[in-house]
Amino acid sequence: VGKINFYLSIISYFQLIAYFGIPTYAVSIGSGKRDNIKCFNRFADEVYTLSVLSTFISCSLLGVIVGRIHSFSDEWKIWVVLSVSIIFNTLGAEWLLQVYEDYFFMTLRYIFIQIAGVVLLFIFVRNSTDMTKYFIIYVIPCVLTGLSNRLYEKRYCRLKIRINKEIQFHLKALFPIF
C-alpha cells in the first residue's frame, strides 16, 4: 500500500501541473460565455489548447525525472501507465460539462465506470505482486471517463487546438490561480 500511495502521490503533483488551474478558470469564465456559442467555442478551444500544452509540459517533466532518478527509471512501465491518466484527464475536458452543468451525465458516468473499476480490481488483483495490474486498472476509469466525455461533449462544442494571441491573455489570468 505504501509503494502504491507513493506512485500516486508523485503522479498527483504532475496532474496539478497539467491542470495549471485550467478547470477552475474555464468553469468561472466559460459559464458567462456559454450562451454566445461562437464566443464560447473560441474560448473553449483556447483553454483546451492551454490544457494540452500544460499536459505536454507535465508529461515531459515526468519523463525527465523518471529518466534521471535511478529508482524511478527501474519502474518506468508504471510511470508510463500512470501518465496515461494525466493525458486522458486533459482530453476529457471535464470542465466543459461543468460549464454546462451537465451533472446528471457526470454522475451516471462516474457510477458506472467506478463500479466497473471495482469489479476489475476484484477479478485481476489477487496479491501484492499484482501492482502493475492494479495501476492499469487504476488508469482504466480515467481512460473511460476521458473517452466518454470526449464523445458526449460533442453536443456542446468540438474542442480543437487553436493557437492565437488570446492564449496569452488566458495564460496571464491562469498564473494567479495556479
Residue ranges and their predicted role:
Residues 6-9, 45-52, 80, 108-112, ...:
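Internal alpha-helical transmembrane segments of multi-pass membrane proteins, especially GPCRs
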Residues 76, 87-108:
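Membrane-interface junctions at transmembrane-helix termini in multi-pass inner-membrane proteins
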